[in-house]
UniProtKB/Swiss-Prot annotation:
Disulfide topology: none
Origin species: Thermotoga neapolitana (strain ATCC 49049 / DSM 4359 / NBRC 107923 / NS-E)
Top-level taxon of origin: Bacteria
Keyword set includes RNA-binding: yes
GO cellular component assignments: cytosolic large ribosomal subunit
Subunit note: Part of the 50S ribosomal subunit; part of the 5S rRNA/L5/L18/L25 subcomplex. Contacts the 5S rRNA. Binds to the 5S rRNA independently of L5 and L18.
Function of the molecule: This is one of the proteins that binds to the 5S RNA in the ribosome where it forms part of the central protuberance.
Entry keyword set: Ribonucleoprotein, Ribosomal protein, RNA-binding, rRNA-binding
Name of the featured protein: Large ribosomal subunit protein bL25
Gene: rplY
Region of interest (Disordered), residue spans: 192-215
GO biological process: translation
Residue runs in coiled coils: none
Length: 215
């Protein structure tokens, strides 16, 4: 489990948030069904360091300290939302979510596509409709990713939400018929198939005419 150290902060509006950012700190908040919002701040350098190793499904051990470096509390949280500056793309705010043990939570799990589809080798295109899969699960059963093998998919084949293999206790929140990935048929392939069908059908018509003339 990834550990992250944060400090308590007193919210004082946008000016204070800007001052924090100038000092290399990022304002954040911790909340949950049984947790009142806790304003905290975190060093940007520390956040950037761990940001590339965590996702929305990564449990984080959050160590909350006061200004005197005393540990106030420790919580197991998940990264709920990251806000970035529109121009610089620097992180400007973070939301941490603390679930309630024993109560199910909703979370988006990354979809991992593995294998090279048969249909792609025939000229088709792999289309992924959902990069993440919304699920409902217990906090201690959150999967890091949902893997789907597309090796056997041919032209026109589709994997629906109902086809996903999920761990025990994890429920997909997509409709059963929702398409997750598919192999699109390129127009060139469709046109060639139609031309072949027409060429095959033509001799049959000629043969029938010859039979009628013989009669």
């Amino acid at each position: 489990m990834v550990s992250l150290e944060v400090r308590l902060r007193t919210p004082k509006g946008k000016r204070e948030a800007k001052r924090l950012r100038r000092r290399g700190e990022v304002p954040a908040v911790v909340y949950g069904p049984a947790t009142d919002p806790i304003p905290v701040k975190i060093k940007r350098s520390l956040l950037e360091k761990v940001f590339h190793t965590i996702t929305e499904t990564t449990p984080i051990r959050l160590v909350i300290k006061d200004d005197e470096e005393r540990t106030v509390s420790e919580k197991t949280v998940f990264l709920k939302m990251i806000q970035r500056d529109k121009v610089s793309e620097a992180i400007v705010h973070v939301d941490f979510y603390e679930p309630v043990k024993g109560h199910r939570m909703r979370i988006n799990v990354p979809l991992k596509v593995v294998g090279k589809p048969v249909g792609v080798e025939k000229g088709g295109f792999l289309e992924v409709y959902h990069e993440e899969i919304p699920v409902e699960t217990d906090p201690d059963r959150v999967p890091q990713e949902i893997e789907v093998d597309v090796s056997s998919l041919d032209l026109g084949d589709v994997i629906h939400a109902r086809d996903l293999k999920l761990p025990e206790g994890v429920k997909c929140l997509l409709e059963d018929e929702e398409a997750v990935v598919s192999i699109l048929v390129p127009k060139e392939v469709s046109i060639e198939e139609e031309e072949v069908e027409e060429e095959v059908a033509e001799p049959e018509v000629i043969k029938r005419k010859e039979e009628e003339e013989e009669e």
